[in-house]
């Protein structure tokens, strides 16, 4: 019997502890609050770089330097860059030092001055530029794409120097424009 009383006493104490715990838990929980935040990101449009027009010197004479005019559509190189409107892009031109004939047996010197490049963040052509900015083709500034048209154009001119004994034929070289978002 004493043993039953001990168990009954322990059961009462256990029950009281359970009641106290159940009574305290709501008060402890009310001292906390929860807030939910979100992580967000917006992926910008992919940049697309297109060669609209090649740099074209036309027919040149042996020993006579020839320049392409940056304002003539048929002569000036025209690259378009499209992407997320208003986003800033870093631009880099990889320019050749020589044009090579089709058999790679003769080359012609080509050069670019610090004023042979223009950047215009508008829709247009070399002849209809809206607000061109003169730029050094070896050190192009970061430029924002047009906010609503999502575009900019890079125009390029240059000069070739045929030798007096330049081999007859067509000459060419690659001009590469690289564009990348700056995050600004």
Q: Where do the protein language model's features map onto the residues?
A:
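Short N-terminal leader segment in a subset of presequences, especially plant chloroplast
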Residues: 9-12, 118-120
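Short stretches within intrinsically disordered, low-complexity N-terminal or propeptide regions
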Residues: 13, 70, 76, 92, ...
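N-terminal small/polar-rich segments of proteins
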Residues: 30-109, 140-184
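Terminal beta-strand-rich extracellular "head" domains
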Residues: 101-139
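Bacterial N-terminal signal peptides
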Residues: 14-26
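N-terminal secretory signal peptides that target proteins for export/translocation
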Residues: 1-10
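Intrinsic disorder/low-complexity segments
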Residues: 27-30, 48, 124, 128
């Amino acid at each position: 019997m004493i043993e039953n009383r001990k168990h009954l006493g322990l059961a009462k104490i256990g029950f009281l502890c359970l009641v106290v715990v159940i009574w305290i838990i709501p008060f402890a929980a009310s001292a906390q609050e929860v807030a939910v935040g979100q992580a967000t990101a917006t992926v910008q449009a992919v940049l697309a770089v297109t060669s609209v027009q090649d740099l074209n010197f036309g027919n040149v004479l042996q020993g006579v330097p020839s320049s392409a005019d940056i304002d003539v559509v048929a002569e000036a190189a025209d690259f378009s860059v499209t992407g997320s409107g208003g986003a800033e892009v870093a631009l880099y031109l990889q320019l050749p030092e020589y044009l090579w004939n089709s058999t790679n047996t003769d080359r012609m010197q080509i050069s670019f001055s610090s004023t042979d490049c223009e950047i215009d963040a508008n829709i247009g052509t070399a002849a209809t530029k809206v607000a061109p900015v003169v730029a050094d083709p070896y050190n192009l500034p970061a430029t924002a794409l047009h906010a609503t048209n999502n575009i900019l154009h890079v125009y390029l001119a240059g000069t070739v120097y045929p030798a007096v004994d330049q081999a007859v034929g067509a000459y060419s070289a690659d001009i590469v424009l690289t564009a990348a978002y700056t995050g600004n």
